[in-house]
């Protein structure tokens, strides 16, 4: 059975505002997913690309769906 991920490549996401990162509150796009080798979903990494081209890696719990009213 194929694993289901919360987000997929191309999805718009927002970094949670309560995360201790300089990217908190910013929106980006999922560029890729790096599944955990032992299929531990909470440890999957999501590669997010920001509008200025920078890529950063986040865990699923650090992300929420982006606001779609201004997309």
Label for each model-derived stretch:
Residues 2-70:
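Basic/aromatic-rich interaction segments and small domains that mediate binding to polyanionic partners
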């Amino acid at each position: 059975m194929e694993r289901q991920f919360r987000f997929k490549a191309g999805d718009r996401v927002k970094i949670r505002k309560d995360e201790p990162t300089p990217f908190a509150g910013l929106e980006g796009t999922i560029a890729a997913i790096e599944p955990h080798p032992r299929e531990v979903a909470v440890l999957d990494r999501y590669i997010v690309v920001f509008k200025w081209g920078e890529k950063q890696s986040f865990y699923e719990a650090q992300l929420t769906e982006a606001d779609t009213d201004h997309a």
